[in-house]
Amino acid sequence: MTQIYTILFDLDGTLVNTAPDLMAAHNHVMRKFGHTEKKLADIKSLAGKGAWIMMQRSFKEEIKDEKVKKEMTKEFIDYYGKNIAKESKLIKGVSEFLIWCKKKNVSMAVCTNKTEHLAVDLLKQIKIYDFFEYVAGYLSLIHI
């Protein structure tokens, strides 16, 4: 069968609802560093453009020390990486659509602001990694 189409998917909020695990990681960092936790709706408005930007949006003017910001962002990434698929779930209909695309010989790839290794880990843990021919994450193409 000839391949005619390719679909490029975003990951967070398109294929997978990652907000609960992002919130857990964010609030872990806030507790650890003595700051106020956020609610799920707040986290959804902060997400996008990667962990550094998400944490910067959360800090706003509250935290001015760049070293502390970097420590908090590192803690976020470390915690999130260890807990990436605790509550994250496929968005309704995604599994059926991926199966349909595979049957129709549609090639598929993922492009995300997550680092590539976190994206691959999440896709593997939720058991959809094998649908994709390529996963491009933050910094994936830096060496090209």
Where do the protein language model's features map onto the residues?
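N-terminal helical cap/lid subdomain that shapes the substrate entry/recognition surface
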Residues: T2-S95, W100, K104, T115-H117, ...
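Short active-site oxyanion
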Residues: N105-A109
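Anionic-ligand binding region
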Residues: V120, K124, V135-S140
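Conserved small/polar residues in nucleotide/adenosyl-binding loops
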Residues: I142-I144
